[in-house]
């Protein structure tokens, strides 16, 4: 993969899906699990809304046990499908990487000797090992989680608009700012991680070549020179990683601040509506919207962090 490659490039995605569809039944099961997790996760705060409005507020404590049992059942189903999703998504990712790595190594074996004279062995090792692990993480932790998160976000938005478009607006006011911050963070992290990958390849290449040619290094008394060269490469590698740390340090506090502002707006407007006897907004809906707002913003942070 080239330095400027995009993990979400359509052509690359189609090529990767060619490997995925070999395990189509596992893929279908993972996709179904992602959909069910989104439904169960969204159902939990809605059950809390029902508990507050239809039982606790009305003093129906005798029937409250049914809501608790339903919430426990929903929680158990969520945990079960999250386990199945995580296991089979990782299994699928490792199977895909296994196939790609075998094909890659066979391809490398077919290269002529002249290619190895021109190419750094360290870079080839980075592509065969590090880049393969990146692809594995795309499937096991990235791609399917992104699909599940997007489904959850769509479901959350639908529930919000269905229950109260007024309270939904208080969330949608903040949403463009968090989307803009997420996009800027995503662009910066993409550049930073490309730089990290490049520096990792340089580091691997340098170490491999010096260890292989250690006799020559010692023969020409270049220990001090090579040590200084290694320090420079290692310093570049450290600076590349520190860029990613810096971007994370900026973005995630901004995301948390946006979430807190959203919760404040929900409590302010929702509480004011309850006091003014607005029949559309109840205490249960306020609790529901607080949880839904967090469910809406959390996937954005995860998407930005992974891609």
Where are these regions (language model features)?
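Membrane-integrated ABC transporters
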Residues: 1-41, 56-70, 85-89, 93, ...
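Transmembrane helices of ABC transporter permease
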Residues: 22, 26-39, 70, 74, ...
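Alpha-helical transmembrane segments
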Residues: 37, 41-45, 73-74, 78-93, ...
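Membrane-embedded alpha-helices of multi-pass transport/permease systems
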Residues: 81-88, 92, 136, 143, ...
